[in-house]
Amino acid sequence: MPRASAEPKVRVDVLADEADDRASLYEATVRRLQGEVKELPAVWLYDERGSRLYEEITRLQEYYLPRREGEILRAHGSAIARLTQAHTLVELGAGTVKNTRLVLDALETGGTLERFVPLDVSEQTLRASAQAIASAYPQVFVHAIVGDFERHLGALPGGGRRLIAFLGSTIGNLYPEQRGAFLGTLAAMLARDDALLVGVDLVKDPARLEAAYNDSRGVTEEFVRNALTAVNRELRATFDQRRFVYEARWDSADNWMDIGLRARQAHTVSIERLGLDLAFEEREPLRVEISSKFRREQFEREAARARLRVESWWTDAAADFAVALLRV
């Protein structure tokens, strides 16, 4: 049974089990490191220091994504509220809930908002966000869920019209087959009056895309390298930062940014806790994350395969980013 705690206007359900989550992460780490392309699960990016670095990234001039998404939500928030008339706003992968506040504001102004349900893996961050939202929106009941958006969608409360928000182009961090499965799961749980709001980064000049992940201050590189530090600390690994060069490049075949590190020379890394020795060849990549970029027709095809239809599509003035409203 999930642990629950209740305070005025705030409820927090903890579905994540730390021991199970660790075991799953270790298994995924072994599987991905032994894949055709060596890869670290992106979870390793988000320890305490990594989360702080990511917050810094969102404020960088080169990293346009949150600004463009915010521009869209400010311009079209009233339309989103009018079209959905949502009683409940669900935020998947809530984190610090920045742009989500723009949707909350629009729904509050529209007079329909009753409940906010943020779901995120970080209990500490989620509790802080839940309290902040409860203070800022005293008439809204906050039901926070500590869990994984790929595993705990079934725990989302029903009742009334729901708007499920998946913002920040987080959907681009999923591989195509993962996206298809995830959208299919969402479609199966959506009622006729529910809607899905998704933020997607759009295909554009590769130079601009690569600049967004190769910032002049090197914060993104530091963020990615911190994943090695986290793995060394927790798994007793021997990743040597000096033996890897940072690389974030546009892959035009797959329409994604490929973000990670590349071995400077052949060497072996030992991961004691996993009982694993990894042999790297010279210039062999170690992927840490992908960030897929979309064209409207491509996104609509993927949605249709999951039995979802795009009802509305909004972009910023520069057509850098889009927010899509979908229904079953």
Task: Give, region by region, the residue ranges found by the protein language model.
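Conserved beta-strand signature within the Rossmann-like core of class I S-adenosyl-L-methionine
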Residues: 188-203
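Substrate-binding/catalytic lobe of Class I Rossmann-like enzymes that use SAM or dcSAM, i.e.
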Residues: 208-292, 296, 300-306
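N-terminal auxiliary segments of SAM/dcSAM-dependent transferases
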Residues: 2-44, 51
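A short, conserved alpha-helix within the catalytic core of class I
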Residues: 173-185
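Class I SAM-dependent methyltransferase Rossmann-like catalytic core
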Residues: 18, 37-86
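Glycine-rich SAM-binding Motif I of class I
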Residues: 97-101
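Conserved class I S-adenosyl-L-methionine
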Residues: 86-95
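Class I SAM-dependent methyltransferase SAM/SAH-binding core
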Residues: 104-151
